Design a protein with these regions (language model features):
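Active-site hotspot residues in diverse enzymes, especially metal/ion-binding acidic/histidine motifs
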Residues: 1-177
Length: 177
């Protein structure tokens, strides 16, 4: 990243979401999880694999040593085959940080930021698009954590009962990241 892009980032206007925008992103993620029919705890990486299977979109994860002044994760949309993405994430960071970067990039894909314009790169993302992707990442991270906790509790009490609605943890507003 050169100095020009860093200055452009500083000049980019701040996006302040309103309540309806927040609810729309929450609903989009909740509906997706419900439609995917997930009934077990998944890591972010497993969720990416399930998303690929559910949508027919190929999302490949690649761990690489990226320059320190670079992104922690970046998505490339491939032109062939159609609907194929490569999420490359920083190898030299913690597992949690890698998962958050992957979830952020998945948030861009879920929100359709690469579908609206061909050749969109990260420098072209608006502050609103970055907020949507970051909020998706926070929701997905919270969902995997809360669902894992809920399943651990129910497994001890009733080991044979499957979770009926895996999107239930997203309805709670307490304990958000």
């Amino acid at each position: 990243m050169d100095a020009t892009h860093r200055l452009d980032d500083l000049r980019r206007p701040c996006f302040k979401p309103n309540a309806s925008h927040i609810r729309a992103v929450e609903k989009q993620v909740r509906v997706l999880i419900r439609r995917m029919g997930i009934r077990e705890s998944l890591s972010i990486r497993q969720l990416v694999e399930r998303y690929s299977q559910f949508t027919g979109t190929s999302v490949l994860l690649q761990e690489r040593l990226l320059p320190v002044d670079c992104f922690f994760a970046i998505t490339l949309k491939l032109t062939s085959p159609l609907d194929a993405y490569v999420i490359t994430y920083q190898q030299a960071t913690s597992r949690w940080h890698q998962d958050h970067g992957i979830a952020h990039e998945l948030g861009h894909i879920i929100s359709g930021h690469y579908d609206s314009r061909s050749g969109t790169c990260h420098f072209d993302m608006s502050a609103q698009m970055e907020w949507e992707a970051e909020y998706c990442a926070n929701i997905l991270g919270r969902w995997t954590y809360q669902l894992g906790r809920a399943l651990d509790r129910t497994k001890d009490l009733r080991p044979m009962i499957p979770v009926v609605d895996a999107s239930a943890p997203l309805r709670e507003r307490l304990g958000w990241l």
